[in-house]
Amino acid sequence: MGKLCCGAVAFALLSVGLGSVQAQNYLTGSVAGPNGPEAGVWVIAETKDLPTRFARIVVTDDEGRYLVPDLPRAEYDVWVRGYGLVDSPKVKATVIPAPAGTGMTLDLAAVPAPSEKEAAQYYPAMYWFSLMHVPDESEFPLGKMSSQSEWLHTVKQGGCQSCHALGTPGTRAIPDMFRKGGEVDSFNAWKERVTAGSSRAAMARDMARLGEPGLRAFAQWTDAIEKGALPFARPERPKGAARNLVVTVWDWSQSTYYLQDLVATDRRDPRVNANGRVFGSAEMSTDLVPILDPKANSTSAVVHPVRDPRTPSTRSDPFGPS
């Protein structure tokens, strides 16, 4: 859970209240900082002891209390994350089979962020993405873009952001392989970056629609962040019903592939495949279909079936270094 990655799948469920705990093998306790209880922060319990990496995440209440329910038997790293904080040191906790209604009490210390810059590293990607300059309506038509709304649609739902979470650490900085040790400016680094990977044709197509003004916008965005620009707004901590969520995250697939989508049921009848396996779509990154068994906390993969064995694979398409 050090980073948010493509090779993970998460489920969110409503938890029971802290006053009616009947869970087995749970962690409970409170989170406090220098000024007292920390409300609305996340407590993360993560392990690599299971067949695949597993993490369960909950939110503290007004008094800083938390409960992580129904943990599989394993040794866990437990820590605190929250807006206005930096990650606390990880504490070890071992969960073993126990009678129903028993668990471990573990009080945790929150660590305030020493600066706005360090606090902002934990903000949602959108807060960083909001630093991108959007051309004013008066500047349109601009290249192939007839209006500001068309420009925004291309950057968001119709293009870039339909696949990428713009504003994540991986997108708000340019990897050195494209900067070549500073020899390439940001404009040309972005020009090369959008021709990388297995989706190079689609990315280059969308950037061509934005034209040079689009490339300049992306270059100026990452330049500003590199020079120290920070999001102009601070996210609020979870409140109300949002504090009742229990989020479970598993790793699946491989770090060299990316996941575009997944299916767990039929949206017309969500009772279909209850507690069953989850199937992923790796789009053009691999011919393997990742599979998660959330009951066994295990993963597997199958080669994507095709009707005609001569069907070409996108793995044979031109592939830009990435």
Which sequence ranges carry the predicted segments?
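Beta-propeller domains
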Residues: 273-275, 279-321
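The canonical Cys-X-X-Cys-His
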Residues: 157-168, 218
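Structural signature of eukaryotic scaffold interfaces centered on beta-propeller domains
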Residues: 255-274, 316-322
